[in-house]
């Protein structure tokens, strides 16, 4: 059992997925090109790698019980049954107690990868039963270098995006590649600086809500389209092919 710790932007969830991909792939992630297994793990479609995440304040006890049941199953196609729990610090003590035995004595075929902002955010009973990996937030220069090497943005744009994102790679990439996001951010800063009356704050809040709704809808559509494209690529389906019932 492993506990991967790092503040927002450090890539702890991506680290967990990459680790899982290396464990499951026949080449252990050493090939120049990613294997099919690696692609499936990173895309979230591998049958033996399960990710527990939540957008709620806490992770429910029923969710943990369900994933424990999954952990007890033998892997179907790979060497390991891997369970990734994002934001394990969101578990209440009662929920954590349900998980303790599995973490302390996992099944021979199962590996647990837990993620949290820091080891101090996790109950001592979890910390003492895991191997801890601490990640650091990348520097502004490192993030800017990543953006220029993986996107088509100019160095000046990459540098500004990295500085504003304060080391958070995901946010920096969004700033660098989506002009509307950067424009909305600049508009917000100017709006706050120009607030003079309570009515100004109300108008600004209304604009922020409208922009957030539009951005959320656009992001959801983009993510859905990307996931479908990746799913089709992994399963050898052309964009115009119908998805067979067995793959749905």
Where are the model-predicted features located?
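Charged, glycine-rich active-site and insertion segments that engage polyanionic ligands
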Residues: 1-22, 28-40, 109, 117-248
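Clamp-loader machinery-focused feature within the broader ASCE/P-loop NTPase space
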Residues: 1-94
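Active-site-adjacent scaffolding segments
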Residues: 46-49, 110-113, 132
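Residues immediately C-terminal
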Residues: 58, 90, 105, 121, ...
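Conserved adenine-binding aromatic site and its adjacent loop/helix in ATP-hydrolyzing domains
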Residues: 69, 101, 124, 128
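A generic secondary-structure signal
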Residues: 70-74, 102, 146-150
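Conserved catalytic/switch belt of AAA+ P-loop NTPases
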Residues: 72-73, 97-114
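Structural recognition of the conserved hydrophobic beta-strand(s) that form the central parallel beta-sheet
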Residues: 83-86, 111-116
């Amino acid at each position: 059992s492993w506990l991967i710790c790092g503040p927002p932007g450090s890539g702890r969830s991506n680290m967990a997925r990459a680790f899982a991909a290396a464990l499951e792939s026949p080449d252990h992630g050493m090939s120049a090109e990613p294997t099919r297994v690696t692609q499936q793990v990173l895309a979230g479609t591998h049958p033996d790698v399960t990710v527990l995440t939540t957008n709620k304040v806490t992770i429910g006890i029923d969710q943990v019980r369900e994933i424990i049941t999954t952990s007890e199953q033998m892997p179907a196609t790979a060497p390991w049954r891997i369970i990734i729990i994002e934001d394990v610090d969101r578990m209440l003590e009662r929920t954590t107690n349900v998980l303790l035995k599995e973490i302390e004595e996992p099944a021979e075929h199962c590996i647990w990868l837990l993620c949290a902002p820091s080891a101090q955010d996790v109950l001592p009973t979890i910390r003492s039963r895991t191997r801890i990996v601490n990640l650091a937030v990348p520097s502004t220069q490192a993030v800017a270098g990543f953006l220029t090497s993986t996107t088509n943005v100019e160095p000046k744009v990459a540098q500004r995006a990295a500085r504003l994102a304060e080391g958070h790679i995901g946010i920096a990439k969004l700033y660098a590649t989506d002009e509307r996001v950067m424009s909305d951010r600049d508009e917000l800063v100017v709006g706050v600086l120009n607030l003079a009356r309570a009515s100004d704050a109300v108008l600004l809040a209304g604009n922020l809500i409208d922009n957030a709704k539009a951005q959320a809808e656009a992001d959801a559509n983009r993510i859905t389209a990307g996931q479908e494209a990746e799913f089709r690529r992994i399963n050898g389906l052309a964009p115009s092919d119908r998805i067979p019932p067995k793959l749905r």
